[in-house]
Swiss-Prot record:
Protein name (Swiss-Prot/TrEMBL): Large ribosomal subunit protein uL3
Listed transmembrane segments: none
Species annotation: Chlamydia abortus (strain DSM 27085 / S26/3) (Chlamydophila abortus)
Record PANTHER family: 50S RIBOSOMAL PROTEIN L3, LARGE RIBOSOMAL SUBUNIT PROTEIN UL3C
Keyword tags: Ribonucleoprotein, Ribosomal protein, RNA-binding, rRNA-binding
Gene: rplC
Length: 221
């Protein structure tokens, strides 16, 4: 069942560590508190099997909770009898796996103890409105004096036939703030005491953003 789980964590930044061969490796640091099951969905009532998990508990007095959480969410947590969380995520599971889980069950980094590689999903950094050279790596025009253009896209269509620009062509537009998954990242270290996971390489998003960690889809076994 644990091989099907996806858990939420927080990107803390990047550091350098030495591996067992003495090589300096750039690592991303992911902190991960316990993910708590807040709802269980079964095929007979919901049409599919899944669990909903919460992370980053909101610890405030109940009388001020309405200032942090909207009423529908408060009612949702009260119905399940769970604590109130800032982040929620639904994970599809098999029928057998759902039957093994109960409300309030907690999952943490121990899920990945025997895993050598993981996939990490997150929302990439927003870059705002950008041109084609930054978005797609276009070469641009001549940089010399007298050039008609330097950073333009260049030709984007023909003349009378077809007499239009094909849709989907690469143009200047908004860049970033999209869901990105980086696959098959090597797990360097898991610190259960500090609740920290070190993975080789970069992961999506800025520091402090929420990322989703799962067992690599390319992992063997």
């Amino acid at each position: 069942m644990q091989s099907q789980l996806s858990l939420m964590g927080k990107k803390e930044g990047m550091i350098h560590v030495f591996d067992k061969d003495g090589n300096l490796v750039a690592c991303s640091v992911i902190s991960m508190s316990s993910n708590v099951v807040t709802q269980i969905k079964v095929d007979s009532t919901d049409g599919y099997n899944a669990i909903q998990m919460g992370a980053n508990e909101i610890n405030v007095p109940e009388k001020t909770l309405h200032k942090r959480v909207n009423k529908p969410s408060i009612g949702h947590f009260k119905k399940s009898g769970s604590r109130v969380f800032r982040e929620l995520k639904e994970v599809r599971l098999s029928e057998e796996a759902v039957n093994e889980v109960s409300l309030g069950s907690e999952f943490g980094l121990e899920v990945f103890e025997s895993v050598s590689s993981i996939d990490v999903s997150g929302v990439s950094k927003g870059k705002g409105f950008q041109g084609v050279m930054k978005r797609f790596g276009f070469r641009g025009g001549p940089q010399s004096h007298g050039s008609g253009f330097h950073r333009h896209a260049g030709s984007i269509g023909m003349r009378s036939t077809p007499g239009r620009c094909f849709p989907g062509s690469k143009r200047p537009s908004h860049m970033g703030t999209v869901n990105v998954t980086v696959k098959n990242l090597e797990v360097i270290k898991i610190d259960l005491e500090k609740k920290v996971l070190l993975v080789k390489g970069a992961i999506p998003g800025p520091r402090g953003s929420v990322v989703v960690v799962r067992r690599s889809s390319r992992a063997k076994g």
